[in-house]
Protein backbone atom coordinates (compact mmCIF):
# COMPACT_ATOMS: atom_id res chain seq x y z
CA UNK A 1 0.00 0.00 0.00
CA UNK A 2 1.09 3.55 -0.63
CA UNK A 3 -0.17 7.05 0.10
CA UNK A 4 -3.08 8.15 -2.06
CA UNK A 5 -4.93 11.41 -2.05
CA UNK A 6 -8.06 12.84 -3.58
CA UNK A 7 -8.52 16.50 -4.38
CA UNK A 8 -11.91 18.12 -4.33
CA UNK A 9 -13.10 21.66 -4.82
CA UNK A 10 -15.28 22.80 -1.93
CA UNK A 11 -17.63 25.74 -1.74
CA UNK A 12 -17.02 27.99 1.31
CA UNK A 13 -20.11 26.59 3.05
CA UNK A 14 -18.83 23.03 2.59
CA UNK A 15 -15.38 23.84 4.00
CA UNK A 16 -16.94 25.54 7.01
CA UNK A 17 -19.62 22.89 7.42
CA UNK A 18 -17.20 19.96 7.25
CA UNK A 19 -14.03 21.16 8.95
CA UNK A 20 -14.71 24.12 11.27
CA UNK A 21 -15.01 21.92 14.39
CA UNK A 22 -12.39 19.31 13.48
CA UNK A 23 -9.84 20.67 15.99
CA UNK A 24 -12.22 20.76 18.95
CA UNK A 25 -12.14 17.03 19.84
CA UNK A 26 -15.60 16.60 18.36
CA UNK A 27 -14.91 13.29 16.59
CA UNK A 28 -12.73 10.26 17.20
CA UNK A 29 -9.47 9.73 15.32
CA UNK A 30 -7.96 6.37 14.27
CA UNK A 31 -4.71 5.25 12.68
CA UNK A 32 -4.46 5.49 8.91
CA UNK A 33 -3.59 2.46 6.74
CA UNK A 34 0.05 2.22 7.89
CA UNK A 35 -0.28 3.75 11.36
CA UNK A 36 1.85 6.76 10.47
CA UNK A 37 -0.92 9.32 10.94
CA UNK A 38 -4.28 9.80 12.60
CA UNK A 39 -7.43 10.43 10.58
CA UNK A 40 -11.00 11.29 11.65
CA UNK A 41 -13.49 8.44 11.72
CA UNK A 42 -16.13 10.90 10.50
CA UNK A 43 -16.18 14.64 9.82
CA UNK A 44 -18.05 16.93 12.26
CA UNK A 45 -20.54 18.03 9.62
CA UNK A 46 -22.80 20.93 10.55
CA UNK A 47 -25.24 20.11 7.74
CA UNK A 48 -26.58 16.75 6.46
CA UNK A 49 -24.33 16.71 3.40
CA UNK A 50 -25.28 13.14 2.50
CA UNK A 51 -28.76 14.43 1.65
CA UNK A 52 -27.63 17.80 0.30
CA UNK A 53 -25.00 16.48 -2.12
CA UNK A 54 -26.46 13.04 -2.68
CA UNK A 55 -24.39 9.89 -2.88
CA UNK A 56 -24.06 6.82 -5.04
CA UNK A 57 -22.16 3.62 -4.35
CA UNK A 58 -22.28 -0.13 -4.75
CA UNK A 59 -20.90 -3.02 -2.71
CA UNK A 60 -21.46 -6.76 -2.46
CA UNK A 61 -25.19 -7.33 -2.08
CA UNK A 62 -26.07 -3.68 -1.45
CA UNK A 63 -26.14 -0.26 -3.06
CA UNK A 64 -26.98 3.31 -2.16
CA UNK A 65 -28.32 5.99 -4.47
CA UNK A 66 -29.29 9.17 -2.61
CA UNK A 67 -30.42 12.13 -4.75
CA UNK A 68 -29.28 15.69 -3.88
CA UNK A 69 -31.67 18.02 -2.05
CA UNK A 70 -32.32 21.72 -1.57
CA UNK A 71 -30.44 23.35 1.33
CA UNK A 72 -33.32 25.61 2.39
CA UNK A 73 -35.86 22.77 2.44
CA UNK A 74 -33.54 20.48 4.43
CA UNK A 75 -32.88 23.18 7.04
CA UNK A 76 -36.61 23.93 7.30
CA UNK A 77 -37.26 20.21 7.76
CA UNK A 78 -34.67 19.98 10.55
CA UNK A 79 -36.18 23.01 12.31
CA UNK A 80 -39.66 21.47 12.08
CA UNK A 81 -38.33 18.19 13.52
CA UNK A 82 -36.62 19.99 16.42
CA UNK A 83 -39.89 21.78 17.25
CA UNK A 84 -41.98 18.61 16.91
CA UNK A 85 -40.26 15.24 17.18
CA UNK A 86 -43.55 13.50 16.40
CA UNK A 87 -44.06 15.28 13.08
CA UNK A 88 -45.67 12.96 10.52
CA UNK A 89 -43.90 11.76 7.39
CA UNK A 90 -46.56 13.52 5.31
CA UNK A 91 -45.99 16.91 6.98
CA UNK A 92 -42.24 16.48 6.63
CA UNK A 93 -42.60 15.70 2.93
CA UNK A 94 -44.68 18.88 2.55
CA UNK A 95 -41.61 20.81 3.73
CA UNK A 96 -39.01 18.77 1.84
CA UNK A 97 -40.95 18.39 -1.38
CA UNK A 98 -38.49 16.24 -3.30
CA UNK A 99 -34.92 15.99 -4.60
CA UNK A 100 -33.25 19.05 -6.12
CA UNK A 101 -31.07 17.99 -9.04
CA UNK A 102 -28.27 20.44 -9.96
CA UNK A 103 -28.75 20.08 -13.72
CA UNK A 104 -32.42 21.02 -13.48
CA UNK A 105 -35.25 19.08 -15.04
CA UNK A 106 -38.78 18.64 -13.73
CA UNK A 107 -39.91 16.07 -11.19
CA UNK A 108 -43.13 14.26 -12.03
CA UNK A 109 -44.74 14.26 -8.60
CA UNK A 110 -46.39 11.01 -7.73
CA UNK A 111 -46.85 8.51 -4.93
CA UNK A 112 -43.25 7.38 -5.61
CA UNK A 113 -41.73 10.43 -3.89
CA UNK A 114 -43.89 9.91 -0.79
CA UNK A 115 -42.92 6.23 -0.82
CA UNK A 116 -39.23 7.15 -1.02
CA UNK A 117 -39.46 9.45 1.99
CA UNK A 118 -41.56 7.00 4.02
CA UNK A 119 -39.61 3.81 3.27
CA UNK A 120 -36.20 4.99 2.06
CA UNK A 121 -36.64 3.43 -1.38
CA UNK A 122 -38.46 4.51 -4.53
CA UNK A 123 -38.23 5.47 -8.20
CA UNK A 124 -38.48 9.14 -9.22
CA UNK A 125 -39.49 10.25 -12.72
CA UNK A 126 -37.56 13.23 -14.14
CA UNK A 127 -38.27 15.12 -17.36
CA UNK A 128 -36.33 17.72 -19.28
CA UNK A 129 -37.81 21.20 -19.56
CA UNK A 130 -39.49 21.60 -22.96
CA UNK A 131 -41.17 24.57 -24.67
CA UNK A 132 -42.40 25.27 -28.18
CA UNK A 133 -41.83 28.46 -30.15
CA UNK A 134 -41.46 29.84 -33.66
CA UNK A 135 -37.84 30.29 -34.69
CA UNK A 136 -36.58 32.70 -37.33
CA UNK A 137 -34.62 30.90 -40.05
CA UNK A 138 -33.06 34.05 -41.48
CA UNK A 139 -33.83 37.09 -43.58
CA UNK A 140 -36.56 36.50 -46.14
CA UNK A 141 -37.40 33.04 -44.79
CA UNK A 142 -40.54 31.85 -43.08
CA UNK A 143 -40.58 31.14 -39.37
CA UNK A 144 -40.70 27.53 -38.33
CA UNK A 145 -42.22 25.73 -35.36
CA UNK A 146 -39.60 24.29 -33.04
CA UNK A 147 -39.25 22.43 -29.75
CA UNK A 148 -36.82 24.12 -27.35
CA UNK A 149 -35.15 22.11 -24.59
CA UNK A 150 -33.55 24.20 -21.82
CA UNK A 151 -32.87 21.49 -19.22
CA UNK A 152 -32.09 17.77 -19.39
CA UNK A 153 -32.66 15.21 -16.62
CA UNK A 154 -29.96 14.57 -14.02
CA UNK A 155 -26.79 12.83 -15.30
CA UNK A 156 -27.89 12.96 -18.96
CA UNK A 157 -25.05 14.11 -21.22
CA UNK A 158 -26.20 16.78 -23.68
CA UNK A 159 -23.91 15.81 -26.58
CA UNK A 160 -24.73 12.12 -26.20
CA UNK A 161 -28.46 12.87 -26.06
CA UNK A 162 -28.36 14.96 -29.26
CA UNK A 163 -26.36 12.26 -31.05
CA UNK A 164 -28.84 9.56 -30.00
CA UNK A 165 -31.79 11.71 -31.11
CA UNK A 166 -30.18 12.24 -34.52
CA UNK A 167 -29.81 8.46 -34.90
CA UNK A 168 -33.49 7.92 -34.07
CA UNK A 169 -34.55 10.61 -36.57
CA UNK A 170 -32.32 9.22 -39.34
CA UNK A 171 -33.60 5.69 -38.76
CA UNK A 172 -37.23 6.86 -38.89
CA UNK A 173 -38.02 5.84 -35.30
CA UNK A 174 -38.93 9.44 -34.50
CA UNK A 175 -40.66 11.40 -37.27
CA UNK A 176 -41.62 15.04 -37.78
CA UNK A 177 -38.17 16.56 -37.12
CA UNK A 178 -36.29 18.44 -39.85
CA UNK A 179 -33.22 19.72 -37.96
CA UNK A 180 -31.49 19.63 -34.56
CA UNK A 181 -29.21 22.42 -33.33
CA UNK A 182 -27.33 23.09 -30.12
CA UNK A 183 -27.54 26.82 -29.39
CA UNK A 184 -26.33 26.56 -25.79
CA UNK A 185 -24.11 29.38 -24.49
CA UNK A 186 -22.99 30.94 -21.22
CA UNK A 187 -26.56 31.88 -20.42
CA UNK A 188 -27.68 28.25 -20.38
CA UNK A 189 -28.77 25.25 -22.39
CA UNK A 190 -30.81 25.64 -25.57
CA UNK A 191 -31.38 22.68 -27.88
CA UNK A 192 -33.50 23.63 -30.91
CA UNK A 193 -35.48 20.86 -32.63
CA UNK A 194 -37.05 22.20 -35.82
CA UNK A 195 -40.29 20.54 -36.88
CA UNK A 196 -41.48 19.68 -40.36
CA UNK A 197 -44.32 21.72 -41.79
CA UNK A 198 -47.25 19.49 -40.84
CA UNK A 199 -45.75 17.96 -37.68
CA UNK A 200 -47.71 17.73 -34.46
CA UNK A 201 -45.46 19.17 -31.75
CA UNK A 202 -47.27 17.37 -28.92
CA UNK A 203 -46.82 14.01 -30.67
CA UNK A 204 -43.11 14.68 -31.25
CA UNK A 205 -42.62 15.67 -27.59
CA UNK A 206 -44.45 12.51 -26.49
CA UNK A 207 -42.07 10.43 -28.64
CA UNK A 208 -39.07 12.25 -27.19
CA UNK A 209 -40.23 11.26 -23.71
CA UNK A 210 -40.89 7.65 -24.71
CA UNK A 211 -37.91 6.94 -26.98
CA UNK A 212 -35.10 9.06 -25.51
CA UNK A 213 -33.79 9.87 -22.05
CA UNK A 214 -35.63 13.20 -22.05
CA UNK A 215 -37.69 11.36 -19.43
CA UNK A 216 -35.84 9.02 -17.05
CA UNK A 217 -36.38 7.24 -13.77
CA UNK A 218 -34.00 7.75 -10.85
CA UNK A 219 -34.00 4.68 -8.61
CA UNK A 220 -33.28 6.03 -5.14
CA UNK A 221 -32.37 4.15 -1.97
CA UNK A 222 -31.40 5.85 1.30
CA UNK A 223 -28.77 3.38 2.50
CA UNK A 224 -26.26 4.79 4.99
CA UNK A 225 -23.82 3.55 7.62
CA UNK A 226 -25.10 3.75 11.20
CA UNK A 227 -22.35 2.82 13.68
CA UNK A 228 -20.56 1.05 10.85
CA UNK A 229 -23.56 -0.98 9.71
CA UNK A 230 -25.55 -0.35 6.49
CA UNK A 231 -29.13 0.67 7.26
CA UNK A 232 -31.96 1.73 4.94
CA UNK A 233 -33.45 4.93 6.37
CA UNK A 234 -36.54 6.91 5.61
CA UNK A 235 -36.32 10.71 5.55
CA UNK A 236 -37.42 11.28 9.16
CA UNK A 237 -35.02 8.68 10.57
CA UNK A 238 -32.15 10.13 8.58
CA UNK A 239 -32.82 13.65 9.90
CA UNK A 240 -33.19 12.31 13.46
CA UNK A 241 -29.82 10.54 13.24
CA UNK A 242 -28.25 13.77 12.02
CA UNK A 243 -29.74 15.77 14.91
CA UNK A 244 -28.44 13.18 17.39
CA UNK A 245 -25.01 13.44 15.78
CA UNK A 246 -25.08 17.25 16.07
CA UNK A 247 -26.09 17.06 19.74
CA UNK A 248 -23.16 14.74 20.43
CA UNK A 249 -20.77 16.94 18.43
CA UNK A 250 -21.87 20.12 20.23
CA UNK A 251 -21.57 18.39 23.62
CA UNK A 252 -18.00 17.28 22.84
CA UNK A 253 -17.11 20.73 21.54
CA UNK A 254 -18.49 22.34 24.71
CA UNK A 255 -16.50 19.99 26.96
CA UNK A 256 -13.38 20.80 24.93
CA UNK A 257 -13.88 24.54 25.41
CA UNK A 258 -14.68 24.00 29.12
CA UNK A 259 -11.50 21.97 29.60
CA UNK A 260 -9.40 24.66 27.88
CA UNK A 261 -11.07 27.38 29.94
CA UNK A 262 -10.44 25.51 33.21
CA UNK A 263 -6.79 24.98 32.22
CA UNK A 264 -6.43 28.70 31.54
CA UNK A 265 -8.20 29.48 34.82
CA UNK A 266 -5.76 27.27 36.72
CA UNK A 267 -2.82 29.08 35.13
CA UNK A 268 -4.40 32.47 35.88
CA UNK A 269 -5.00 31.51 39.52
CA UNK A 270 -1.41 30.33 39.81
CA UNK A 271 -0.09 33.58 38.34
CA UNK A 272 -2.35 35.57 40.66
CA UNK A 273 -1.04 33.74 43.73
CA UNK A 274 2.53 34.09 42.50
CA UNK A 275 2.06 37.83 42.01
CA UNK A 276 0.68 38.24 45.54
CA UNK A 277 3.61 36.30 46.97
CA UNK A 278 6.26 37.48 44.53
CA UNK A 279 9.05 37.62 47.15
CA UNK A 280 8.49 34.00 48.21
CA UNK A 281 8.33 32.92 44.58
CA UNK A 282 11.62 34.66 43.80
Give, region by region, the residue ranges found by the protein language model.
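Long hydrophobic segments that form regular secondary structure
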Residues: 131, 135, 139-180
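Catalytic phosphate-handling regions of large nucleic-acid enzymes and associated NTPases
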Residues: 1-125, 190-192
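Structured alpha-helical segments in the cores of large, soluble enzyme domains
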Residues: 14, 43-51, 124-133, 165-177
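Long, charged, helix-rich clamp/arm modules that form nucleic acid-engaging surfaces
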Residues: 1, 100, 144-146, 153-154, ...
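A generic structural signal for alpha-helix starts
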Residues: 66-69, 156, 160, 199
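Hydrophobic side chains in well-ordered alpha-helices
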Residues: 74, 161-164, 204-205
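N-terminal non-catalytic structural scaffold regions of very large proteins
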Residues: 96, 112-114, 170, 220, ...
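Signal for well-folded cores of large energy- and translation-related assemblies
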Residues: 11-22, 34, 48-52, 79-83, ...
Amino acid sequence: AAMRYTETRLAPIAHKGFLEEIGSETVNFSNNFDGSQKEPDVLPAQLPFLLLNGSSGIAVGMATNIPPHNLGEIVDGLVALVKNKDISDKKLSNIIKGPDFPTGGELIYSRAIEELYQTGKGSITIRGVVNTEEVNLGKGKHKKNAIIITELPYQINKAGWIEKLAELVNSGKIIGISDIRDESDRDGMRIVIELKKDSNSELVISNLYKKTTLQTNFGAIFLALIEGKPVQLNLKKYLNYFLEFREETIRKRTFYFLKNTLDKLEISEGLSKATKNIKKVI
